[in-house]
């Protein structure tokens, strides 16, 4: 793999890693509904403000979010709203996985009777 291709994959991985935490996923899905202030995000995810701020910083650095000041508030929104489509794909993959596992459990329970 050449250096440019490697760098491209590293940047892609950075974006995926920026979404790769349960709190960050919740923030992304919340911000899919529109711009929100930190106070609303903290309330929604139920985490400490400092913890939420750290997660927001990771996503800002990766280019997933953007922020702006509105008086004393800091407002956040998705910089790349299409990330929600990626998460919908992840949701579908999870549903399919759960269906496969449910089928295996059903088969196992019928064998053990």
Task: Label every model-predicted segment.
Residues 2, 7-50, 70-83:
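N-terminal helix-turn-helix DNA-binding core of bacterial DNA-binding proteins
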């Amino acid at each position: 793999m050449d250096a440019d291709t490697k760098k491209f994959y590293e940047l892609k991985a950075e974006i995926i890693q920026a979404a790769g935490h349960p709190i960050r996923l919740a923030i992304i899905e919340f911000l899919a509904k529109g711009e929100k202030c930190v106070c609303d995000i903290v309330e929604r995810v139920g985490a400490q403000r400092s913890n939420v701020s750290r997660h927001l910083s990771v996503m800002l650095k990766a280019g997933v979010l953007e922020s702006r000041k509105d008086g004393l508030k800091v407002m956040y929104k998705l910089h790349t709203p299409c990330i929600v489509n990626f998460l919908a794909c992840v949701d579908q993959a999870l549903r399919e996985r759960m269906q496969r596992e449910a089928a295996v459990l059903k088969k196992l329970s019928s064998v053990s009777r």
